[in-house]
Design a protein with these regions (language model features):
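Membrane-embedded translocation segments of transport machinery
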Residues: 2-36, 41-74
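Feature marks hydrolase-like catalytic cores characterized by long aromatic- and Gly/Pro-rich stretches
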Residues: 36-39, 49-187
Length: 187
């Protein structure tokens, strides 16, 4: 089903992200049948709209509903073709938001959460450290972990996630640092 329930309107809406993942699942299925002649495949799909600023609360809820629906759809599709244990799906973005308001929403930040899904993934684990939050009011937070203006430095970078998956594909440590030059900034 390529429709998801929009948490704001309560209406079912078309999911372009789920449609992209439908194409990926079909391509994986063709690869399993030996029609493509490749051993490992990499696919990229995208969902924009995360530059929310002052519309963050309602817009972010809808965006996360789209991601949740599309990942569930893809997991179901992979299960139907017997590929769930052979596919790792992950989100990757260096785009985050600040924790503090700029008076009209939040600004661009460095820290963000990523999801990893697949039959070979040890689920339920969180990597990195969640920042300490101190409530200033019902909708305002502060943190001693801020660098400045509400920006947080991530403890686990998207580069580390990408390098881990790259090593699975056969990258050496030296190649990983060439592909992900910020690796040296994280331990």
């Amino acid at each position: 089903k390529l429709q998801y329930p929009n948490p704001l309107s309560g209406q079912n809406e078309f999911s372009a992200l789920a449609q992209q993942l439908q194409v990926v699942a079909r391509t994986i299925q063709a690869g399993q049948a030996g029609k493509l002649g490749v051993k490992r495949q990499v696919f990229f799909v995208s969902l924009g709209g995360f530059d929310t600023h002052n519309n963050q609360n309602p817009t972010h809820a809808d965006l996360l509903a789209r991601v949740a629906h599309a990942m569930r759809y893809f997991d179901t599709a992979l299960g139907a073709i017997g590929a769930r244990n052979n596919v790792t799906t992950f989100t990757a973005s260096d785009f985050g938001r600040t924790f503090t308001s700029n008076g009209d929403g939040t600004d661009h930040g460095w820290g963000a959460h990523q999801f990893v899904m697949g039959g070979a993934v040890r689920g339920g684990d969180l990597y990195g450290a969640f920042p300490t939050l101190v409530a200033k009011s019902s909708n305002e937070f502060d943190s001693p972990d801020q660098v400045r203006n509400g920006a947080m430095l991530p403890t686990t970078s998207v580069d580390q996630l990408g390098a881990t998956l790259g090593r699975w594909f056969g990258l050496s440590d030296g190649q990983a640092t060439q592909v992900f030059p910020n690796l040296a900034n994280f331990n």
